[in-house]
Amino acid sequence: MSLRPCLTPSSMQYSDIYIHTPHPHPHPHPHTPTHTHPHTPTPTPHPHPHTPHPHTTPTPTPHHTHTPHTTLSNLSLNLPSHYPTSPLVTLPHSTIPLPTTIHLSTYYYHPPPIITVTLQLPISNSTTITLLLPYHPPCPTHCTVVLPSILKR
């Protein structure tokens, strides 16, 4: 049986990898809005809050992840037991299988406390998944993967 039907985002098609970088003051939600709006039907002028502003962010955009300025760090990937791979996967270098797409949403502080990587499912049944991450400190980070419940059996 294959899990390749066209899943909708409402069916939790994407799995989120949260990379927590070493930070003396961890901020679990760095982009939490500090302003509170009353409940008004007026749409906000920022329909894409996850899109970094190119005029204020001097870091590489997610579309230029193959720049020579990108630092590659070793990541430890912990997968739930119901995921069709080994429970522990190490990411030494990084190549995502062709059927899989990767989206980087980076919120750069100094250093970025959280880098969110979205992987489109299904992911290939390989034992190694590599991620190319723009990361300032070259020390190891940890990836926690939250997979869609549709893979649970």
Swiss-Prot record:
Q: State the taxonomy lineage.
A: Eukaryota, Fungi, Dikarya, Ascomycota, Saccharomycotina
Q: Using the UniProt annotation, give all residue ranges assigned to the region (Disordered).
A: 17-78
Basic residues bias located where?
A: 22-38
Instruction: State the superkingdom.
Output: Eukaryota
Protein's name according to its UniProt entry: Putative uncharacterized protein YHR217C
